[in-house]
């Protein structure tokens, strides 16, 4: 067993940011990480849920980053496959770049797969490319009138730019008014629960980045000319990603085991309820276990990935200004419910050029833009990794994703009633037949998505207040109230460890992660 180190870093949360921080501290410093996880599950929103032999990725996590440090981190812990996975063996596929000498996924579990990325929009009971492409099928599916209106709207948006004071204007500037109203307006309201005119453009700049109809045109020309550049191609247009054999939770569970092997401590069912601060420094935390027992732990640093409103509520022995409390309390979030369905087959079939088993659709996820149903996205777990599915050859394992707010009608609905509604919605839009449903489960995630409205616009005041607490570092999606991808959450942890190593109390490099204009993977 590794020797315990003298100085302690208290880490709130065993998601990607918290676990990355703990791992990096053990590898690069003489500090002892102690991780407190409120639930009994490793991985946060990047967990993998197991149900009757099937595995469900909550929200879908493509492993892709423009940051080489992150890519190398992933593939060092979980090497890239050196032989074909079972689905490629069945189909006789030989089109993937395998890692010579890498593990065989048919024989080994600690392996990361190379996967093709296919995401599409389902609208008007038809499939559209995501992002919207200029293929003939797009215009055929839209019809002549929508095509003319879309072309005119895009032309107007090229010569008349709106002030980007809202997400609505952000989208109109990039796609034109009519395409926005068709493909973005209703879906965005479904996801966030408010109209895009009330959402900040920040979300678009962080999630959509440089994607626009013009970017799609340039990418199409680049492909025609045979030119490919990862650095210059928008990340939403990159066509492959890597993915752990058993989903993201497998990687994070492995990281957790490595942390413990190296002497780090991970305490599960440990809800941090108080953070003691003296002379602008965190001195200790109180956590409550599953039996309700409160325990105090001292530390030299605190890395927090907990929601900002919970962090402010937990601050003790310090006079938190009323305005800071108000801003934190009013920060908006969007919650998330997934229904896992095991079905015999889907009604919709593969009409793409991509070869698939039993002619199944090739998509990893589908954006459901239909306005007569509440479902937001549909995951096809067979296509993420065939090893997520207990009976890959004979069943389809899918995830029906709903965006909601804690306490609203969807959130409060009884589980059986919710599952019935979800099944009925897929039947309604002709994706499944009810009699093909074999099994179902439901998973609910609180505060899955930080939202960009309300007191979010005053968040800088809270950041400034936190930065005055010398040894407090806010990391990850909820820790920074920023809609990060997994790699960004990891980078906040890496930058925090760098700051400690350098003895640098300036936390700007940590807050600055995910502010670059060309960073995101969103397809």
Model-derived regions, located:
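Active-site/ligand-binding neighborhood in enzyme catalytic cores
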Residues: 136-138, 142-143, 147-278, 283, ...
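Conserved Rossmann-like nucleotide-cofactor binding loop
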Residues: 17, 41, 309
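Glycine-rich FAD pyrophosphate-binding loop
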Residues: 26-51
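N-terminal Rossmann-like FAD-binding beta1-loop-alpha1 element of flavoenzymes
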Residues: 7-35
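Dinucleotide-binding Rossmann-like beta1-alpha1 core, especially the glycine-rich loop
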Residues: 52-158
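General small-molecule cofactor/ligand-binding pocket signal
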Residues: 265-267, 438-441, 473
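C-terminal lid/capping helical subdomain adjacent to the catalytic/cofactor pocket in oxidative enzymes
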Residues: 443, 452-523
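Mid-domain catalytic core of redox enzymes
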Residues: 28, 268-412, 416, 420-430, ...
């Amino acid at each position: 067993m590794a020797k315990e180190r003298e100085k302690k870093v208290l880490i709130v949360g065993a998601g990607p940011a918290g676990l990355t921080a703990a791992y990096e501290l053990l590898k690069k410093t003489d500090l002892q990480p102690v991780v407190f996880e409120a639930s009994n599950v490793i991985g946060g929103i990047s967990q993998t849920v197991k149900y009757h032999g099937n595995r469900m990725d909550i929200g879908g996590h493509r492993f892709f980053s423009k940051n080489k440090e992150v890519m190398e981190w992933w593939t060092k812990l979980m090497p890239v496959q050196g032989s074909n996975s079972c689905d490629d063996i069945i189909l006789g596929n030989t089109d993937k770049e395998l890692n010579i000498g890498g593990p065989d996924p048919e024989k080994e579990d600690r392996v990361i797969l190379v996967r093709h990325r296919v995401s599409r929009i389902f609208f008007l009971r038809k499939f559209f490319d995501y992002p919207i492409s200029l293929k003939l099928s797009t215009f055929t599916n839209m019809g002549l009138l929508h095509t003319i209106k879309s072309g005119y709207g895009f032309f107007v948006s090229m010569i008349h730019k709106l002030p980007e004071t809202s997400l609505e204007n952000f989208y109109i500037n990039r796609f034109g008014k009519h395409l926005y109203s068709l493909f973005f307006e209703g879906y965005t309201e479904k996801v966030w629960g408010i109209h895009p005119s009330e959402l900040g453009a920040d979300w678009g700049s962080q999630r959509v980045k440089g994607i626009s109809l013009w970017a799609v045109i340039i990418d199409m020309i680049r492909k025609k000319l045979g030119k490919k550049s990862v650095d210059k191609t928008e990340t939403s247009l990159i066509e492959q990603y890597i993915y752990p054999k058993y989903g993201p939770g497998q990687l994070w569970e492995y990281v957790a085991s490595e942390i413990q092997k190296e002497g780090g401590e991970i305490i599960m069912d440990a809800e941090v309820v108080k953070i003691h601060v003296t002379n602008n420094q965190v001195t200790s935390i109180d956590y409550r276990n599953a039996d309700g027992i409160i325990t105090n732990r001292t530390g030299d640093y605190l890395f927090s990935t907990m929601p900002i409103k919970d962090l402010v509520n937990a601050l003790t022995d310090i006079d938190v200004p009323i305005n800071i409390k108000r801003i934190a309390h009013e920060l908006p979030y969007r919650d998330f419910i997934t229904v896992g369905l095991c079905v015999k087959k889907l009604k919709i079939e593969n009409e793409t050029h991509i070869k698939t088993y039993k002619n199944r659709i090739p998509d990893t996820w589908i954006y459901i833009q239909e306005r007569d149903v509440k479902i937001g996205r549909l995951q096809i777990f067979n296509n993420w990794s065939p090893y997520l599915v207990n009976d890959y050859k004979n069943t389809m394992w899918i995830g029906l994703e709903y965006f909601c707010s804690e306490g609203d009608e969807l959130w409060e609905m009884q589980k059986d009633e919710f599952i019935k509604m979800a099944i009925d919605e897929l039947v309604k839009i002709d994706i499944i037949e009810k009699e093909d449903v074999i099994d179902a489960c439901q998973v609910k995630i609180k505060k899955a998505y930080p939202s960009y409205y309300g007191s979010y616009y005053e968040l800088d005041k809270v950041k400034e207040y936190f930065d005055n607490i010398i040894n407090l570092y806010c990391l990850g999606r909820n820790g920074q109230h920023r809609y990060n991808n997994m790699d960004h959450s990891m980078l906040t942890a890496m930058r925090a460890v760098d700051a400690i190593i350098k003895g640098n109390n300036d936390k700007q490099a940590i807050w600055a992660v995910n502010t670059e204009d060309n960073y995101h993977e969103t397809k």
